[in-house]
């Protein structure tokens, strides 16, 4: 039994930046440091930050006055930003710059009183934050998830000639393309972003799974169940005909998965650390894997700076 390791996998630049922001804030300002929502969707990472003094909350009313709060990588609505400002909370923004790009697209469309369609999953914090960028009283913003959702928009959209679409950054590339095709069919004049909203890391990790799924008998995806991009990797493997399993830790592995397997694929979502991947590999070796081969893939060199305040403090 052999393991094929996907490349690229694991942390993306946005996740790396978000975690660094929490770590530096803890070092410089001392705990507790409050974080609105899980800074990234990974249980291993969140538990580690909790042990160091981070306190994760869902709403700003859980943050005491005169404290620091960090916004998660998924972004927040303008209403949340305004609330933090009114309470004079010290804010460090860990929103992924690629999510911020989508926020700016929505805000720009809102100022032009265009209607906006967001392709995304209801209830996901990134979707809530993106929807919360829209402020036009005369337009409207609508959420769709599947191509079948698009037809119902015909009764809602006021001006099909003044319509714009954006998407959640962590979706399935193929499924998003299907929704966009349907939007363009139903609304021929709809406008979209100059560059695809699906983030580079989401695209690259899905491409790596496509390569791996053709070769392996089983695909193991390291990531938490509330991680959108990790879930999409599992779903993609299954769509390509390979059994996929999404796991948070080595203890989640069922030896039965590998009974008839000769090649096991392993990848990790953008919020899963390499330390956790190594633990998973060790467990699969205990179950009989004799070697690990890393598959060649697209090289990533993206890097996002942390806020200047934390950079300056670190120098001092």
Swiss-Prot record:
So where does isopentenyl diphosphate get bound? 41, 74, 124, 227-229, 271
Where, by residue number, does (2E)-4-hydroxy-3-methylbut-2-enyl diphosphate bind? 41, 74, 124, 169, 227-229, 271
Q: In which pathway does it act?
A: Isoprenoid biosynthesis; dimethylallyl diphosphate biosynthesis; dimethylallyl diphosphate from (2E)-4-hydroxy-3-methylbutenyl diphosphate: step 1/1; Isoprenoid biosynthesis; isopentenyl diphosphate biosynthesis via DXP pathway; isopentenyl diphosphate from 1-deoxy-D-xylulose 5-phosphate: step 6/6
UniProt cross-references to InterPro entries, sorted A to Z: LytB/IspH
UniProt: [4Fe-4S] cluster binding residues: 12, 96, 199
Coiled-coil parts of chain: none
The GO terms this record gives for MF are:
4 iron, 4 sulfur cluster binding; 4-hydroxy-3-methylbut-2-enyl diphosphate reductase activity; metal ion binding
Q: Which UniProt keywords apply?
A: 4Fe-4S, Iron, Iron-sulfur, Isoprene biosynthesis, Metal-binding, Oxidoreductase
**Record-annotated active site:** 126 (proton donor)
How is its cofactor bound, per UniProt?
Answer: Binds 1 [4Fe-4S] cluster per subunit.
Q: Needs which cofactor?
A: [4Fe-4S] cluster
Q: GO:BP terms for this protein?
A: dimethylallyl diphosphate biosynthetic process; isopentenyl diphosphate biosynthetic process, methylerythritol 4-phosphate pathway; terpenoid biosynthetic process
Could you name the Gene Ontology cellular component terms for this entry? cytosol
Positions annotated to bind dimethylallyl diphosphate: 41, 74, 124, 227-229, 271
> Which residue windows are transmembrane per the record?
none
Q: What EC number(s) does the entry state?
A: 1.17.7.4
Family (UniProt): Belongs to the IspH family.
According to its UniProt entry, the function of this protein is described as: Catalyzes the conversion of 1-hydroxy-2-methyl-2-(E)-butenyl 4-diphosphate (HMBPP) into a mixture of isopentenyl diphosphate (IPP) and dimethylallyl diphosphate (DMAPP). Acts in the terminal step of the DOXP/MEP pathway for isoprenoid precursor biosynthesis.
* UniProt-recorded name of the protein: 4-hydroxy-3-methylbut-2-enyl diphosphate reductase
What species is given as this protein's source?
A: Vibrio cholerae serotype O1 (strain ATCC 39315 / El Tor Inaba N16961)
Its gene?
ispH
């Amino acid at each position: 039994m052999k393991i094929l390791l996907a490349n690229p996998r694991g942390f993306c630049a946005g996740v790396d930046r978000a975690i660094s922001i929490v770590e530096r804030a803890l070092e410089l300002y001392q705990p507790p440091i409050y974080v609105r929502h899980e800074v990234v969707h990974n249980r291993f990472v969140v538990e580690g930050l909790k042990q160091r003094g981070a306190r994760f909350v869902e709403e700003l009313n859980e943050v005491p006055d005169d404290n620091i709060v960090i916004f998660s990588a998924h972004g927040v609505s303008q209403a949340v930003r305004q609330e933090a400002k009114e309470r004079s909370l010290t804010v460090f923004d860990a929103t992924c710059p690629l999510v911020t790009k989508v926020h700016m697209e929505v805000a720009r469309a809102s100022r032009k009183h265009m209607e906006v369609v967001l392709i995304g999953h209801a209830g996901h914090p990134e979707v809530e934050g993106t929807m919360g960028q829209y402020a036009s009283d005369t337009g409207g913003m609508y959420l769709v998830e599947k191509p079948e959702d698009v037809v119902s928009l015909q009764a809602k959209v006021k001006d099909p000639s003044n319509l714009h679409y954006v998407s959640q950054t962590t979706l399935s590339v193929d499924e998003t393309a299907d929704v966009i095709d349907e939007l363009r069919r139903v609304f021929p004049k709809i406008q979209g972003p100059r560059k695809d909203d699906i983030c580079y890391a989401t695209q690259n990790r899905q491409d790596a799974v496509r390569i791996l799924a053709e070769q392996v008998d089983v695909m193991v995806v390291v990531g938490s169940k509330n991680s959108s991009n990790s879930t999409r990797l599992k779903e993609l493997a299954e769509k390509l005909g390979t059994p996929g399993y999404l796991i948070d830790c080595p203890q989640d592995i069922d030896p039965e998965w590998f009974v008839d397997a000769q090649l096991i694929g392993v990848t990790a979502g953008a919020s899963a650390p390499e330390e956790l991947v190594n633990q998973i590999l060790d467990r699969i070796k205990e179950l009989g894997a004799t070697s690990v081969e890393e598959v060649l893939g697209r090289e990533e060199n993206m890097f996002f700076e942390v806020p200047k305040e934390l950079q300056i403090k670190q120098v001092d």
